[in-house]
A protein has these predicted regions:
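Nucleotidyltransferase catalytic core that binds NTPs
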Residues: 1-248
């Protein structure tokens, strides 16, 4: 298996949060574009069920799999993350922006080399497991750290039937053993069920786009509104159309 190319940590200017030897840190990485309640719910589930000391939200500069999606500036996403990550055990960080590559394997290799006495666990939602085989060197991620997958509405069956889940089926641990997952040598992963949040970054972006379009439509001069143009062209066709409401 191809290994991650690792530059010695001392040569990299990235500064992740402090972690003391012996601590167990959960890593939730992503573009957080934007962050939402489900991110916090996933983190708190992992904190409680795995007995983690902290969860780091690793806010990436961009997602290689979502190049066509508009990504808000990193500083803006960091600000939003801090406003949502109200749990004192959740730490928001953007150190990945200072790493040579944006891939998870490189991030994990850097952290493990920098803090060899800290136990790291990768956290992700079931929606990410469903498409995990699209990630760069995804198999390697499973061999580097234990992985916890937290259920997401409508994604359980797709996640558990995914290529990644099938490839590492023998490494799956019962949910009842979640408390010992961080101490289990990789590859090892478990699937957590529990309270769910329907929030998603995609849905939030789509809603914002729709709202923007509606605002733009209302801002059009009255003579540019489609129904007015239609009436001007054919009065008979719009005889039953009521007058436009005030403020339109």
């Amino acid at each position: 298996m191809r290994q991650s190319t690792l530059i010695h940590p001392a040569c990299i200017k990235a500064h992740p949060p402090h972690a003391a030897p012996g601590q167990t840190i959960g890593l939730l990485g992503g573009s957080f574009n934007p962050p939402h309640a489900a991110h916090r719910l996933i983190s708190e589930a992992a904190l409680k069920r795995l007995g983690l000391d902290k969860v780091w939200w690793i806010v990436s500069p961009g997602n290689p799999l979502k190049r066509r999606v508009h990504t808000a500036p990193l500083a803006e996403r960091m600000h939003l993350c801090r406003s949502i990550a109200t749990n004192p055990h959740i730490v928001v960080t953007d150190f990945e922006a200072d790493l040579p590559t944006p891939y998870t394997t490189s991030t994990l290799a850097f952290l493990k080399a920098r803090s060899p006495l800290v136990r790291f666990v990768w956290i992700m939602g079931a929606d990410n497991l469903a498409s995990f085989d699209r990630w760069e060197r995804w198999r390697e991620i499973f061999t580097m750290v234990p992985v916890v997958v937290v259920d997401r509405p409508g994604w359980r069956l797709k996640a558990l039937a995914s290529k990644a889940a099938r490839a590492f089926a023998k490494s799956r641990r019962p949910e009842t053993d979640a408390a010992t997952l961080a101490q289990t040598p990789p590859p090892a992963w478990t699937f957590l069920t529990g309270p769910l949040s329907h929030a998603s970054s995609t849905a939030i972006r789509n809603k914002a786009k729709t709202n923007h379009q509606q605002v733009a439509r209302k801002a059009q001069p009255p003579e540019e509104l489609p129904w007015r143009k239609l009436k001007a062209e054919s009065p008979e066709a719009t005889a039953e159309i009521p007058a436009a409401p005030e403020g339109s």
